[in-house]
Amino acid sequence: MFDSVEAVRFDREMSNGRTKPILINCERINGDEVEVVAKFSFGCDNSPNGLIREALAAMLAKDLGLPVPEPFLVSITPEFIASVENQAVLHLLKNSNKHGFGSHKLPDGFGVWTASSGRMSKKLEQEALEVFAFDAWLTNADRRIKNPNLLTDGRSFAIFDHEYTLMTDLNLGWQPPWIQGALAGF
């Protein structure tokens, strides 16, 4: 499961992302505030189904112990929407469902790992292998060099942006595993 939070303050648009993610402050049920990178239905390439796939994959990653930022169900109120002055974001929020998906903002110090960063530690190598297996299992074709959705602080990774997981219609030759003989070649 994941916690519900309510958007209380718009900060800014994120610099990357086709789905037009935004950075907002949200309030937990207990009143604590948390910075959240949130996506809403109107900005999704893949309809609201992309947000559902993203939430499912994030919860599964969390349950498997993979390095995923804390996921949230983000609620937006008419008062929050009215407080947003950025016209593009205002348009996005007005045309979206009133619940979106969010991830706890990563702390400063996370960035893209490159070969020039030096050799990975054994711990990072193991995490990279686990993330690769997870992405292969969920058919995530969106984690690639030109899409920085796997970041590191040198000690651990953080994976996010799972909207393109579970999209079996994009996989040539994919067969539902519950059909007799579908896994015969494996």
Task: Outline where the language-model segments fall.
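C-lobe/activation-segment region of protein kinase-like
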Residues: 163-166, 170-186
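Conserved kinase catalytic-core segment
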Residues: 109-171
